[in-house]
């Protein structure tokens, strides 16, 4: 089955994101596809751990594609390997984020900026944190990074909502 057919039937327009712009914090970065790998805790338990992009934002391959329903998840470093999400904590509700798939522009407005504990957090807290990168019934773009810059004890989660369907128009036609 083709990706197009799986995501919405024949004629559906779905493509991998390839660039993210956030004008308010001077971000204009490539987006690459990310997967995950098996990792082991100190006590020998095996778990899945997301890969993280270097010098780019990473699109989580089990998340939605731009123009399709669901949660589009991008992650990136805040203090190493390009520090592409270094300034996420400067975003405020109403700030714009633009996700590109080739020449197609998908505009979003920041709705929430959350900072949640991660290091030494309870299993329940970490499970609650992980819910932000799962699928939702509504359309959203979720950006995730470590926080703060000096010790990464928390996660910063930015949720942005589509501006409207006219802002996902082909850039050449605007």
Task: Write out the residue ranges for each language-model feature.
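Solvent-exposed, non-transmembrane regions of membrane-associated and secreted proteins
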Residues: 1-174
């Amino acid at each position: 089955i083709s990706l197009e057919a799986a995501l919405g039937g024949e004629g559906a327009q779905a493509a991998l994101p390839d660039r993210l712009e956030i004008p308010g914090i001077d971000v204009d970065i490539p987006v690459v596809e990310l997967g995950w790998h098996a990792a082991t805790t100190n006590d020998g338990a095996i778990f899945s751990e997301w890969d993280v992009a270097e010098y780019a934002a990473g699109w989580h391959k089990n998340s939605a594609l731009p123009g399709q329903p669901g949660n589009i998840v991008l992650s990136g470093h805040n203090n190493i390997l390009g520090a592409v999400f270094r300034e996420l904590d400067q975003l405020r509700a109403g700030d714009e984020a633009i996700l590109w798939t080739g020449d197609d522009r998908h505009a979003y407005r920041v709705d929430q900026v959350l900072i949640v504990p991660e290091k030494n957090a309870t299993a329940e807290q970490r499970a609650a944190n992980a819910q932000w990168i799962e699928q939702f019934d509504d359309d959203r773009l979720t950006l995730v990074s470590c926080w703060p810059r000096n010790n990464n004890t928390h996660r910063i989660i930015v949720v942005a909502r589509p501006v409207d369907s006219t802002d996902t128009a082909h850039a050449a036609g605007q």
